[in-house]
Amino acid sequence: MKHYSVLKNEMIQALDCLKEDSILIDCTLGFGGHTIGALQAYPNIEVYAFDKDIYALNLAKERLKPYLQNIHFCHNAFSQFLDIVPNVVLPRVRGIIADIGVSSMQLDETQRGFSFVSSTLDMRMDTRADLNATKVINTYSPIRLEEIFRIYGEVRQSKKLAEIIAYERKKKPFSSCLELSTLIEQHFPRVGGIHPATLAFQALRIEVNDELGELKRLLHNIELAFDEGKIASCRVGIISFHSLEDRIIKQCFKQWSKSCICAEESLRCECGNNHAKGQILTKKPIIPTPQEIAQNKRSRSAKLRIFELKSSKDKGV
């Protein structure tokens, strides 16, 4: 199985803060590419590897057999890391990485209900979850569908798409991605080489897996762990694939870097001007090289942002 870990070298370079007894939290293990790269570069670290997708987790376990003594596999949502990683080892966490979004193997596996030609309409990364794409498409109101397509997919004709789906499902409920993608292709023209169902499928996947909510909870829990002193100095590197995710990460990192947290209308600082949690290490996001994009076209929209959390001790305060 061919697999490409997006921005792998750039992510590993960002982890040069790892020491011999450090812990790395890989929030999105996938096929294990970033974890393998980290363990090859820093062989004595310990990794807590998260993935909601049991299929991906089992494949990764096979691929990571040479490193099993260094890895704790966690079949959990990455936002739950504070409940899974023992408090006693949290101070050793020096890196937290995430590669947000669907993997190539999920897209290419037609039985998972992610691809345009899938015979199912599922899109769950965690098959234990109740909500799937079939329920969204066949039971959500046209108004709610329009919101999902417009907000999560930034679909230009979101209202038209929602109305077409609502009309067609009265005749026969949708049961496969192929049916849905074919319908979209019939009513909406291709733009360049991009399939007209791409953004609609993105929106459905985000809704089914609560992807933006998961990302926000992850960032909140990282901040919480840092503020409570459970995590000290640590690098946070997150790869995103569309503007909604990137905006959340960018705004969060910007907030973390602020020394002054007074209201904007304040005439002078009254907060002490010492609230920065660290510094942004990527003024502009790191993007794939032309060579990487040529090798893996799905990497073309990837952006990596890195933040360095610094405890008062490491700041010299």
UniProtKB/Swiss-Prot annotation:
Alphabetical GO biological process terms: rRNA base methylation
Entry's localization field: Cytoplasm
Binding residues for S-adenosyl-L-methionine: G32, G33, H34, D51, F78, D99, Q106
InterPro entries in UniProt: RsmH, SAM-dep_MeTrfase_MraW_recog, SAM-dependent_MTases_sf
Class of this enzyme: transferase
Gene Ontology MF annotations: rRNA (cytosine-N4-)-methyltransferase activity
UniProt keyword terms in alphabetical order: Cytoplasm, Methyltransferase, rRNA processing, S-adenosyl-L-methionine, Transferase
EC id: 2.1.1.199
Any one cellular-component term (Gene Ontology): cytoplasm
Catalytic activity: cytidine(1402) in 16S rRNA + S-adenosyl-L-methionine = N(4)-methylcytidine(1402) in 16S rRNA + S-adenosyl-L-homocysteine + H(+)
Family per record: Belongs to the methyltransferase superfamily. RsmH family.
Annotated function: Specifically methylates the N4 position of cytidine in position 1402 (C1402) of 16S rRNA.
Protein name: Ribosomal RNA small subunit methyltransferase H
Source species: Helicobacter hepaticus (strain ATCC 51449 / 3B1)
Organism classification: Bacteria, Pseudomonadati, Campylobacterota, Epsilonproteobacteria, Campylobacterales
